[in-house]
Curated annotation (Swiss-Prot):
This is Biosynthetic arginine decarboxylase. One of its GO terms (molecular function) is arginine decarboxylase activity. Pfam families: Arg_decarb_HB, Arg_decarbox_C, Orn_Arg_deC_N. Belongs to the Orn/Lys/Arg decarboxylase class-II family. SpeA subfamily. Pathway: Amine and polyamine biosynthesis; agmatine biosynthesis; agmatine from L-arginine: step 1/1.
């Protein structure tokens, strides 16, 4: 593939921007993966890797996970903050604290811990805290405890502190402080406390409600003062060491981040005036990733990079400290999405294609109903030279005639053959109009979008949107989706992707299309009998954890892929995926009982013994098979 063709494909799918140097198109027109852009020779052809795995028994859909990307993301964020601190003469330290709620899988936690980079861990529940405490011995032992807490949660955190870890119990509501002080006295340990301040500043977009004055978490200004006085009276003011705030997840606009950090810096200054020696400044999450590749303020993009993010935070905190003669605190960010999103690709196969194939019908009979005659007249006019009617007018006329025919069909005026004739002619008209539209003409864009959606291929993909990409369904989040091969061809077709659940919501509604978002996906020409595999990218944050069991489709298989500079690749199975039996047990249906009940029914039939045994074996094999569609 020429460099010009490769450049065009990169622009079509915006790979150069959302791919972040981890994903690219190689000379074969295949997606390639480079888990560490600092080692460009270590890369793998993803399409070929999947085919090799399939030949070895790999089932699809499957998650292809690249732990080396996780480690590179952590190094990149740490490096950005190091540069910012050096640039602005910031004397405080920096810590990335990974909030495990983003992805609690062992491969993620342990890959980050073993990266050799400074790292803390954050927990938001008792279960998460237990996972964090068990792994804390492998890190520099910074633990941040967020979320609502009961006595057991608080005791666990204090036990971690007593074991020698730095465990910050962040006070989210005033009722927690009495329990903390009580349990600290019982355990004879000095608690290390934080306070989450509820800011007036708020981001925008799909996750804005997680920040601002209406946020679910945090203390208002009056409550912060109350907490300070409570601790002063208890002689524990020195325990309050961390200031925490959260603007929202996936912050698209750097200006919103800068505004929020400036407001929170005032809390830091005012708390010092009250005698509180805040040592850590936890800015929470918000560091976004560019799912669209548009470098914009849209909900699924960001208009900044790692360096600008780090510079804004370090400058704002440092400036407030210099202005008020205060020490530079240790800066903490809880950048889970930015660490994990890129490292996972869902790969699946297309199990069926429905194309809008058409043939131009012959002229209707002379005594055919008027609506059919009208459609034919419009079709003929479209091919007459010098016609003055617009493309839009032709399209509208044919749509009105087709609408009348559909209504007439319901009332018995038109036959099935006449309806089919009209629909074929309408598709022919749409195709003819499409050929004459100019994408550079702004007036044509709405018609182009309408026809692309009408004429798009329907691709039925072997996956559950609700299990593997729940945010695409729940909050209409966009994820990059494209074929793993055939990218050396011009994307002349359009497609929409549908999952295999029995739910009309199981469809992807938005796709990357150059610098914009479209309701159909650009597709290279392909063999409908052997369509390409598809990759759903940047699904490493939240999707595995939020996925639900709609239609009892379970977790997919997952493999960890390691790529080395000599071209070698190691693949480890990290999750075998759920069986049908696993999913049935989730809903209290015992597989053995079901098998017994089915066996009893089979025995009551008049089928011969051999056929009965065959049916029983098939039923049992299905129980312990994959929940997704499998090749025969």
């Amino acid at each position: 593939m020429s460099s010009q063709e490769a450049s065009k494909m990169l622009r079509t799918y915006n790979i150069a921007w959302w791919g972040n140097n981890y994903y690219d198109v190689n000379e074969l027109g295949h997606i390639s993966v480079c888990p560490d852009p600092d080692v460009p020779e270590a890369r793998v052809d993803l399409a070929q890797l999947v085919k090799t795995r399939e030949a070895q028994g790999q089932r699809l859909p499957a998650l292809f996970c690249f732990p080396q990307i996780l480690q590179h993301r952590l190094r990149s964020i740490n490096a950005a903050f190091k540069r910012a601190r050096e640039s602005y003469g910031y004397n405080g330290d920096y810590f990335l604290v990974y909030p495990i709620k983003v992805n609690q899988h062992r491969r993620v936690i342990e890959s980050l811990i073993h990266s050799g980079e400074p790292l803390g861990l954050e927990a938001g529940s008792k279960a998460e805290l237990m996972a964090v405490l068990a792994h804390a011995g492998m890190t520099r032992s910074v633990i941040v405890c967020n979320g609502y807490k009961d006595r057991e949660y608080i005791r666990l955190a204090l036990i971690g502190e007593k074991m020698g870890h730095k465990v910050y119990l962040v006070i989210e509501k005033m009722s927690e402080i009495a329990i903390v002080l009580d349990e600290a006295e019982r355990l004879n340990v000095v608690p290390r406390l934080g306070v989450r301040a509820r800011l007036a500043s708020q981001g925008s977009g799909k996750w804005q409600s997680s920040g601002g004055e209406k946020s679910k978490f945090g203390l208002a200004a009056t409550q912060v003062l109350q907490l300070v006085e409570t601790l002063r009276e208890a002689g524990r003011l020195d325990s309050l060491q961390l200031l925490h705030f959260h603007l929202g997840s996936q912050m698209a606009n750097i200006r919103d981040i800068a505004t929020g950090v400036r407001e929170s810096a005032r809390f830091y200054v005012e708390l010092h005036k009250l005698g509180v020696n805040i040592q850590c400044f936890d800015v929470g999450g918000g560091l976004g990733v560019d799912y669209e590749g548009t470098r914009s303020q849209s909900d699924c993009s960001v208009n900044y990079g790692l360096n600008e993010y780090a510079n804004n935070i370090i400058w704002a905190i440092g400036d407030a400290c210099e202005e008020n003669g205060l020490p530079h605190p240790t800066v903490i960010t809880e950048s889970g999405r930015a660490v994990t999103a890129h490292h996972t690709v869902l790969v699946s196969n297309i199990i069926g294609v429905e194309r809008n194939e058409y043939t131009v019908p012959t002229a209707p009979a002379e005594d055919a109903p008027r609506a059919l005659q009208s459609m034919w007249e419009t079709w003929q006019e479209m091919h007459e030279p010098g016609t003055r009617r617009s493309l839009r007018e032709w399209l509208h006329d044919s749509q009105m005639d087709l609408h009348d025919i559909h209504i007439g069909y319901s009332s018995g005026t038109f036959s099935l053959q006449e309806r089919a004739w009209a629909e074929q002619l309408y598709l022919s008209m749409c195709h003819e109009v499409q050929k004459q539209l100019d994408p550079q003409n702004r007036a044509h864009r709405p018609i182009i979008d309408e026809l692309q959606e009408r004429m798009a291929d329907k691709m039925y993909v072997n996956f559950s949107l609700f299990q593997s990409m729940p945010d695409a369904w729940g909050i209409d989040q966009l994820f990059p989706v494209l074929p793993l091969e055939g990218l050396d061809q011009v994307p002349e077709r359009r497609a929409v992707l549908l999952d295999i659940t029995c739910d009309s919501d199981g469809a992807i509604d938005h796709y990357i299309d150059g610098d914009g978002i479209a309701t159909t996906m650009p597709m290279p020409e392909y063999d409908p009998e052997n369509p390409p595999m598809l990759g759903f990218f940047m699904v490493g944050a939240y999707q595995e954890i939020l996925g639900n069991m709609h239609n009892l489709f379970g977790d997919t298989e997952a493999v960890d892929v390691f790529v080395f500079p000599d071209g070698s690749v190691e693949v480890e199975l990290s999750d075998e995926g759920d069986t049908v039996a696993d999913m049935l047990q989730y809903v209290q249906l015992d597989p053995k009982t079901l098998l017994t009940q089915f066996r009893d029914q089979v025995k009551k039939t008049d089928l011969d013994a051999e056929l009965q045994q065959q049916f029983l074996e098939e039923f049992e094999a299905g129980l312990y098979g994959y929940t997704y569609l499998e090749d025969e």
